Every structure is written in C-alpha cells, then in structure tokens.
C-alpha cells in the first residue's frame, strides 16, 4: 500500500498544533532534512500560512494579501 503525499491542508492541520512561532520554527527545521523537494515545497507553503496565522493571532482559510506585510 503506497502512501499518498500530504497536501498543503494536511500539513496546515498538523502545523496548527504549534502554538508559538518558536515551536513552528523547530518543526520547520526538523522537516527540512526529512522531506523530499516536492514535499518540502508544499510543507513550506503550509508553514508560511501558519506563520501568518500565528503573527496575526487569527485562523485563515486563505491569507489576505494585506497580512503578508507583517510576516518576517
């Protein structure tokens, strides 16, 4: 049985367990070495989404473009 790759939404739901930016950065650092390049691109997209949520202290389905200026 082959595993199907996780989607951005799958990664985002897992990353929502991270309650602080520090924890999120630790998870990103760990996954940097464990995921393939294709999986990493999807993971980084979800991680950026979660970083925006943590920075604004709100959950978003889609991040408004105005929020990105607050993300480092």
Curated annotation (Swiss-Prot):
It comes from the Bacteria. Disruption phenotype: Deletion results in a large increase in the production of extracellular and intracellular hemolysin. At low osmolarity minor changes in overall translation, at 0.4 M NaCl expression of about 25 proteins altered, including decreased OmpA, crr and AhpC (in strain 5K, not a K12 derivative). At 0.3 M NaCl in strain W3110 up-regulation of 113 genes and down-regulation of 8 genes was observed; a double cnu-hha deletion up-regulated 134 and down-regulated 5 genes, most of which are thought to have been acquired horizontally and are also up-regulated in double hns-stpA deletions. The keyword Chaperone does not apply. The record marks 25, 48 as: Interacts with H-NS. Induction: Expression is autoregulated. Induced during biofilm formation. Changing residue 50 to H: Derepression of the hly operon, impaired H-NS binding. Changing residue 39 to Q: Does not affect H-NS binding ability. It holds the Pfam family HHA. Keywords: Repressor, Transcription, Transcription regulation. One of its GO terms (biological process) is regulation of DNA-templated transcription. One of its GO terms (molecular function) is DNA binding. Down-regulates hemolysin (hly) expression in complex with H-NS. Stimulates transposition events in vivo. Modifies the set of genes regulated by H-NS; Hha and Cnu (YdgT) increase the number of genes DNA bound by H-NS/StpA and may also modulate the oligomerization of the H-NS/StpA-complex. Binds DNA and influences DNA topology in response to environmental stimuli; does not however interact with DNA in the absence of H-NS. Involved in persister cell formation, acting downstream of mRNA interferase (toxin) MqsR. Histidine-tagging (His-tagging) at the N-terminus does not impair interaction with H-NS, whereas His-tagging at the C-terminus does impair interaction. Forms a heterotrimeric complex with the H-NS dimer in the absence of DNA. Hha and TomB may form a type II toxin-antitoxin (TA) system. This is Hemolysin expression-modulating protein Hha. The gene is hha.
